[in-house]
Amino acid sequence: MKILVSDEIEKVCPSFVGAHVEVSVRNTPYSEGLWNEINRLEQLFRATLTTETLKDISGISATRRVYRACGKDPSRYRPAAEALIRRMLQGKELYQISTLVDLVNLASIKFGYSIGGFDAEKFEGDTLTLGIGKAGEPYEGIGRGLINIEGLPVYRDSRGGVGTPTSDNERTKINLNTTHLLVLINGYDGNEESVRANAEFLIRLACDFCEGHDASYYIYR
């Protein structure tokens, strides 16, 4: 899959760096080992963060800045990494969906980047373009119904929007039959070293908990 970054994104975030990750996998409903890792990280967050200081995490802070630059209120449409960590800090259970979805969430909260996790076989066309949502653009968020993506960074395939930092799209979501995982890591803070580390961590999780193989990633701008 080819990834293009539009001029409108370059204008609001010239330092943007992303990682495209692909892995062949076998999904399962639940992994105890993975949830042990998630629970350990949750304990660390509760000991070191508050719902205010989590906004200072580099990836979260940068994504919030881009939302504002695009005209979106980041407190109303929270980046997914922030929303997940905030949920932990409020003492709420993190959503348990499936092993693939859960490991993408773990990779996101560990590094603070909003990450899109997709079933690669559900895309239309061979190119994803990162742009900004338009007024009235149709978009069905996973478990959210139709959402207003005007002013949100959005990846589009040849049919339309598939992923934003707030919510991915129902059309390309992961399910238990997913065998070809595609992940997009969004480094709005421009920290290539951290984005690479996030990609490598995610691949490790996929190999450890979803029989991952034929894994690869590349950096894009």
Predicted feature residues:
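Charge-biased, low-complexity intrinsically disordered regions
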Residues: 1-221
